[in-house]
Amino acid sequence: MARLALINREEKRVKLAEKFSAKREALIATINNQNLSEEERFAARLQLQQLPRNASPVRQRRRCAVTGRPRGVFRKFGLGRNKLREIAMKGEIPGVVKASW
């Protein structure tokens, strides 16, 4: 199981990204708008740089909802490969069966 501090750090990043998402999108739209002057676009870039680093969605990492494991996480289920296998073998995920051909 991942350390609790790492799991909490990821939750903090998710909250920050949600909090600043509208402002971030507006600033990026301003920066990419070719009709505005260079000064306005540069000022928007400076404002974007003033936002917290953890407010960027790029810094987020998917983690297993059960264990907090950062690697091998299936997006569709939000679970790590190990826990997904355990839960699927118990039959707790509808429609998921072991492959055989």
Swiss-Prot record:
Keywords from the named record: Ribonucleoprotein, Ribosomal protein, RNA-binding, rRNA-binding
One GO-annotated biological process of the protein: translation
Single GO cellular component term: cytoplasm
GO molecular-function term, one example from the UniProt record: rRNA binding
Disulfides per UniProt: none
UniProt similarity note: Belongs to the universal ribosomal protein uS14 family.
Assembly: Part of the 30S ribosomal subunit. Contacts proteins S3 and S10.
PANTHER family reported in the protein's UniProt record: 30S RIBOSOMAL PROTEIN S14, SMALL RIBOSOMAL SUBUNIT PROTEIN US14M
Purpose: Binds 16S rRNA, required for the assembly of 30S particles and may also be responsible for determining the conformation of the 16S rRNA at the A site.
Entry protein name: Small ribosomal subunit protein uS14
Native organism: Chromobacterium violaceum (strain ATCC 12472 / DSM 30191 / JCM 1249 / CCUG 213 / NBRC 12614 / NCIMB 9131 / NCTC 9757 / MK)
Taxonomic path: Bacteria, Pseudomonadati, Pseudomonadota, Betaproteobacteria, Neisseriales
Gene: rpsN
